[in-house]
Design a protein with these regions (language model features):
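Acidic, serine/threonine-rich low-complexity disordered tracts
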Residues: 18-114, 155-255
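Sec-dependent N-terminal signal peptides
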Residues: 4-13
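Intrinsic disorder/low-complexity signal
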Residues: 17-18, 76, 120, 136, ...
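Hydrophobic, well-structured mid-protein blocks that either form specific transmembrane helices
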Residues: 108-154
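Low-complexity, intrinsically disordered regions enriched in charged/polar residues
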Residues: 10, 143-150, 184, 243
């Protein structure tokens, strides 16, 4: 279940020329979410933006479950990516999944000059990560402006979404280069524990035919202001849906 929400957090990719360096989150940010399945609080997730200097930023996303869910099916997932330049195109991407008995590490290294992305996916026998169950290495041809799925999440927040039409982009994830469509559904008012927010509702869709085949429909509500805070996300799963609600945020220097 947590993997569906993480996929939601990471599933957007853009190559627009808006200046991300001036975005409020570029100087540091921490977003904390409560993950719910129906009326049940299933876990939490944090997304951090950490400036590294020399025009580089590290994006970190961590998700975990809690309570009874953790005793039945423990989840502890982490994603890190380092991006560089005004567009913050990713240099590297690393995803570590620990979900029940499933343990894997995925890496992507972007070679912009060589127009390729080198991907490595490793599944381990157990949580100690010493015995390899299987490993697949893949090289994907890129055009030079592709994002990984986490840096792309911040790309959409830097865009001027007012009045824009549906747009198509591409990103590298898993073992291939994907085509993505972003549908802008318009403005809505969203009420959370943090208050009421005027938002722009967007829907990323995966696949050449515009169908979100991987995990059902995903909706993201971004505040209609310069912060573009993702205050609410929902994604359909085979049984019900997962809701990610922003419960705390901080912009500026974070630890």
């Amino acid at each position: 279940m947590k993997r569906f929400f993480l996929f939601a957090l990471w599933l957007v990719a853009f190559a627009f020329a808006e200046d991300m360096a001036s975005a409020p989150w570029a100087k540091g940010e921490k977003l904390s979410y409560r993950l719910s399945w129906g009326f049940i609080t299933a876990g939490s997730a944090d997304m951090l933006t950490l400036p590294l200097g020399d025009g580089k930023i590290e994006f970190v996303s961590v998700a975990r479950n809690n309570g009874a869910f953790n005793s039945i099916y423990p989840v502890a997932d982490t994603i890190r990516t380092i991006s560089v330049g005004e567009r913050f195109l990713p240099e590297s991407f690393k995803k570590i999944l620990n979900e029940g008995s499933y343990h894997s590490t995925s890496k992507i290294f972007f070679d912009r000059e060589g127009k390729k992305a080198v991907l490595s996916d490793t599944v381990f026998e157990n949580s100690k990560r010493k015995e390899i169950k299987r490993r697949v290495d893949t090289t994907v041809t890129i055009q030079g402006y592709e994002h990984c799925i986490i840096s792309a999440f911040y790309r959409v927040r830097s865009m001027d979404l007012t009045g824009k039409k549906d747009t198509y982009f591409s990103a590298v994830s898993g073992k291939k280069r994907y085509s993505l469509q972003v549908v802008i559904h318009g403005k809505e008012t969203v009420e959370t524990d943090l208050g009421k927010f005027d938002c722009i509702k967007v829907e990323p869709m995966l696949g050449d035919d515009g169908a979100f085949k991987a995990s059902g429909r995903l909706f993201i509500w971004l505040t209609d202001d310069a912060r573009r805070l993702p205050v609410l996300m929902t994604v359909k799963i085979p049984i019900g849906s997962i809701r990610g609600e922003l419960v705390q945020f901080r912009q500026g220097t974070v630890n």
